[in-house]
């Protein structure tokens, strides 16, 4: 017959197709027989939806490894944290002796011009991302050495970027904990996309420091000022001698 096509095996391909159930059975047998998941209350309570940024930041803020750079009395307050009274291990702080294993630099104490290149070298050897805490007045502004010292650096932020300033002379251990908590919040809000934008650079650093000589502010003129001859208190008639009388007594 010219108008009909006969299959070689005697079956018509248009009418002898497998059923939908047969196709489903074949698919389940060949593509891995995995049943539909049953989402229960117990399973839903053990599932956490998060992002790669949150997971990475959680791991970093829970394991801050500080490099302790202590040069003065502020470091004694930080050394108290290592003891069992404050127990700074609960924040995941593990002090490291090598800058290549640390991601947090804690500068505590006065920084001099001679120690400035060594501090910058330690900071550059730390892997990214890295953070800096300036601890104490001498580290932040130079402290009591900022008025007349020719060797003290007026703020460590002139050498390396600082993420958190911790004022005090010296700061108490509780204040150090507060600084660590604030730093952990900063780490937890970071993102991979914003890391290049937030990358901090050195503000300025020059060797030699190019300091120029200025006139001294301490002239000693206040030693020649005459004092008033008044009693220290109404009940005690003890007069105050002026500078000239004190000089005469010393000469005699």
From Swiss-Prot:
EC number(s): the record gives: 7.1.1.-
Listed Polar residues bias regions: 225-236
What Gene3D superfamilies does the record point to? 3.40.50.12280
Any GO MF annotation of the entry: 4 iron, 4 sulfur cluster binding
Q: Give GO cellular component annotations, separated by semicolons.
A: plasma membrane-derived thylakoid membrane; respiratory chain complex I
Q: Which cofactor does it need?
A: [4Fe-4S] cluster
Instruction: Output the PANTHER family linked to this UniProt entry.
Output: NADH DEHYDROGENASE, NADH DEHYDROGENASE [UBIQUINONE] IRON-SULFUR PROTEIN 7, MITOCHONDRIAL
Describe the function of this protein: NDH-1 shuttles electrons from an unknown electron donor, via FMN and iron-sulfur (Fe-S) centers, to quinones in the respiratory and/or the photosynthetic chain. The immediate electron acceptor for the enzyme in this species is believed to be plastoquinone. Couples the redox reaction to proton translocation, and thus conserves the redox energy in a proton gradient. Cyanobacterial NDH-1 also plays a role in inorganic carbon-concentration.
Output this protein's name. Answer: NAD(P)H-quinone oxidoreductase subunit K
